[in-house]
């Protein structure tokens, strides 16, 4: 696959072509996913749950993220590598820069930070210092204890209005991409239209500029046995993992995934 850059992703949004993203934590799957055409490999702090066996992402350290980012880099064949800043790694703007620098040195092309408009100062600092940022909004797993669980965000009009305003504010602060998780499909569509940067969805309907799933979820693997509504098992009916990855890419590109049953209403 030709090397994917931010320019590539912005071009896909401009053309109306969907962007494909999957989580990835090691060299073998990085090679498989990138060769299947997955454009963005997300080294997610979800590794705390699917690899380390924790019940949340909170125990994950920045050293963990750097280790797995370096592993993904070694197997990657052209995809853009996006790495999460884990819990409290961006407690202050300067701390965020220090931790982001570690991840960029490990091989990340961009970092992802969970939050809302209060992230503006941090995003501005990172962008000015050459670190592209993806802002993660909606259901933010690092704040699951504040949210009261893994719940859809933005169903109330006041919350939806604030989320739209926050998205615009973060773009103005320098965010290069947005990720919306567990947001009503209509709200996600409105935010996607309101900003000029690519918007990736997970449980956010089909109108976003692209889609992401946790690798283990889309392969039908689960420690808990609980399958989120927005997940589809792409291993079903496929002879091997490479075929499942290719099926995911095709489904996102042709907008056959996500279907209406994978989204949420207001």
UniProtKB/Swiss-Prot annotation:
One of its GO terms (molecular function) is magnesium ion binding. The lineage of its organism: Bacteria, Pseudomonadati, Pseudomonadota, Gammaproteobacteria, Pseudomonadales. Binds 1 Mg(2+) ion per subunit. It catalyses: 3-methyl-2-oxobutanoate + (6R)-5,10-methylene-5,6,7,8-tetrahydrofolate + H2O = 2-dehydropantoate + (6S)-5,6,7,8-tetrahydrofolate. GO terms for cellular component: cytoplasm. It comes from the Bacteria. Its cofactor is Mg(2+). CDD domains: KPHMT-like. The active site is at 181 (proton acceptor). It is found in: Cytoplasm. 3-methyl-2-oxobutanoate binds at residues 45-46, 84, 112. Its EC number is 2.1.2.11. Keywords: Cytoplasm, Magnesium, Metal-binding, Pantothenate biosynthesis, Transferase. Its main location: cytoplasm. This is 3-methyl-2-oxobutanoate hydroxymethyltransferase 2. It is an enzyme of class 2 (transferase). Homodecamer; pentamer of dimers. Mg(2+) binds at residues 45, 84, 114. One of its GO terms (biological process) is pantothenate biosynthetic process. Catalyzes the reversible reaction in which hydroxymethyl group from 5,10-methylenetetrahydrofolate is transferred onto alpha-ketoisovalerate to form ketopantoate. Belongs to the PanB family. The keyword Secreted does not apply. HAMAP family: PanB.
């Amino acid at each position: 696959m030709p090397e994917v850059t931010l320019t590539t992703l912005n071009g896909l949004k401009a053309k109306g072509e969907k962007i494909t993203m999957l989580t990835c934590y090691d060299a073998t799957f990085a090679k498989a996913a990138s060769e299947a055409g997955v454009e963005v490999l997300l080294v997610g702090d979800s590794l705390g749950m699917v690899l380390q066996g924790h019940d949340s992402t909170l125990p994950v350290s920045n050293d963990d993220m750097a280790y797995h980012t370096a592993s993904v880099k070694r197997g990657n064949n052209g995809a853009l590598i996006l790495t999460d800043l884990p819990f409290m790694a961006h407690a202050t703007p300067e701390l965020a820069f220090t931790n982001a620098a570690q991840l960029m040195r490990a091989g990340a092309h961009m970092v992802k930070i969970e939050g809302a408009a209060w992230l503006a100062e941090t995003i501005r600092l990172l962008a000015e210092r050459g670190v592209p940022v993806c802002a993660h909004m909606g259901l933010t797993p690092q704040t699951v204890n504040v949210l009261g669980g893994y719940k859809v965000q933005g169903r109330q009009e006041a919350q939806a209005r604030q989320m739209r305003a926050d998205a615009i504010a973060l773009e103005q602060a320098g965010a290069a991409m947005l990720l919306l998780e567990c947001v009503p499909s209509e709200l996600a569509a409105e935010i996607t239209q309101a900003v000029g940067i690519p918007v990736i969805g997970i449980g956010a309907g089909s109108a976003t500029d692209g889609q992401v799933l946790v690798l283990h979820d889309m392969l039908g693997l689960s420690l808990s046995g609980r399958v989120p509504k927005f997940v589809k098992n792409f291993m079903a009916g496929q002879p091997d993992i490479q075929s499942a990855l290719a099926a995911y890419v095709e489904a996102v590109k042709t907008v056959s995934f996500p279907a209406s049953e994978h989204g949420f209403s207001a």
